[in-house]
């Protein structure tokens, strides 16, 4: 059985939320989408995501909200992310960080794992484990539990994101780069059948 997963670029502020409100329902219907992921870390004015905007996105049809280095820019997210499994933060944050970095969902009978990882370059206020080693370790644990694995890699440099794509080629279904808010025109299927794009852009404007 085939499934269709829609991964929306970073939702930025009010324009991004409005774009989702006006278009997501029809897009899901037109493209027969089974599951919707959105990078929501810029939903609240471009700087983090607050509880109310997270709730709003989920009500508008988003199934899973991912984040990046701005996960905890809004203090209320420290508590809220621990109680809502539909929001994930980078899996390579330090042990003990509130929330989770992995979400396993059953979509039309197929178990799919979604992982978010954060790159090491140019995020000075974060203390991160190596995302490449982290990805390998997580995938090793999940490979017998899930039929597909999708990775969001939130990183500043093209080199980091393309390295992750090659590192995981053949091990996961997709590696989706985020952070720059600029859609790249390099979507492709890697030699070992992993789908990837360096950056999937944004919804709205910053």
Give residue ranges: language-model regions.
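Acidic, metal/ion-coordinating pockets
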Residues: 1-206
